[in-house]
Amino acid sequence: MNNSEGKNFLVDVLKILPDDLDCLIQAPSLENSTIQAMMLDSEFDYFKSIYLDKERKMDFINEDVDHSIGNYIQHIQIRKGVELLFEGFNGVEHGTLSKLVNIPAWFKEKYIPDTCRRSSEW
């Protein structure tokens, strides 16, 4: 995978997901003040919580485009309500999308199956 593909993977995932998302993020070395201001404590050790409405989702995307914040994320879970929609690991270089997510053809061509897979369970 080239660097631009890895950098854009998280951005592209967020673009195909709906707004109003709950994210659990494990990123102990992330020092980006914009993202840190969005983070709240979560009920899970080592994870912070971020709620992404439409505006905050765009802010998050812009921070990743400008500062590659995805590189600092060890583990991310993105949910809509109780449904897990995406789980990513290791700088969000790869991940798994829910079978409930409508995946556009351009995303499939760019990322599936090498960078992203589709869960058959959730």
Residue ranges and their predicted role:
Residues 1-122:
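Structured alpha/beta or helical-core interaction and ligand-binding surfaces enriched in interleaved
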